[in-house]
Amino acid sequence: MDKLNAISIFCKVIETQSFTLAAKQQNISVAMASKLVSQLEEHLKTRLLQRTTRKIMPTEAGMMYYQRCQGILLDLDEADSSITQLTSSLQGNLLISVPRDFGLLFIAPNLPTFMAKHPHLHIEVEFNDKKIDLLSEGYDLALRIGYMEDSSLVSRKIGTTTVHFAASPNYLETNGIPQTPDDLEHHNGLLYKNAMNQVNWVGSRINQTQRFKIQSKVVSNSGFALLNMAKAGLGIANLPKFILGRAFEKGELIEILPEYKQQKLEIHVVYPNRRHLPIKVTGISLNF
């Protein structure tokens, strides 16, 4: 039995209340339509339709099965449509929010190529670290870094990053290299302050978790600003690897306490949990 075809013809019979009309819509014979529904009933070991000479009605089990299968068939049609339209040009207006530093590094440089492929799409991009309510504020899509709290959003993981302590060679030469977390209390901290106002540093060594204390010399919501301050020798920064990576490679910054690994941060693309999302949203989400 072709189960998907059997389910499809069964749903059509419910909707048209006719094997003849259902068979015509599916481009099969009436005999084949009847056979598929009978095979489905045999497979489920229950009667789905009450057949009389005048009309066809679903049984209680049949109506329950129809309601569940109808949703599945709609999802399949939507999946087919999204892939088909993904290969063509997207269109419409799109409002998205991305973390400031991540967006400037990875989203902004790739927008020209993406927009050239989809010239009928108009995108408004907000580069900020504010935690937004996608539905109430009218956003179509957002990128988020860190723990996902809002279960009402659909999310898709697109990567991970790690966080590291770092300072310039000049700063460490002048102030000494911290050997233990307790040593951090005697250093200048360049602290990142996100929308949740979390400026505490937490790391783990083996199976031990420890909270690091440090005096805040500068607090900022810009990772790039803190990066430049750290390179200038102002203090010790604690930033994601995607911001620090090039400075590490060039020797402009040195990692501190590398044995204290901080929790990995997951990067997600998120969008509202709406059943029939516009193709422009699903299309662009698959491009991340």
Swiss-Prot record:
SUPFAM superfamilies: Periplasmic binding protein-like II, Winged helix' DNA-binding domain. Residues 1-59 form the HTH lysR-type domain. Pfam families: HTH_1 (PF00126), LysR_substrate (PF03466). GO terms for molecular function: DNA-binding transcription factor activity; sequence-specific DNA binding. The keyword Acyltransferase does not apply. Residues 19-38 bind DNA. The keyword Transit peptide does not apply. GO terms for biological process: DNA-templated transcription. Signal peptide: none annotated. Keywords: DNA-binding, Transcription, Transcription regulation. Belongs to the LysR transcriptional regulatory family. This is Uncharacterized HTH-type transcriptional regulator HI_1364. It comes from Haemophilus influenzae (strain ATCC 51907 / DSM 11121 / KW20 / Rd).
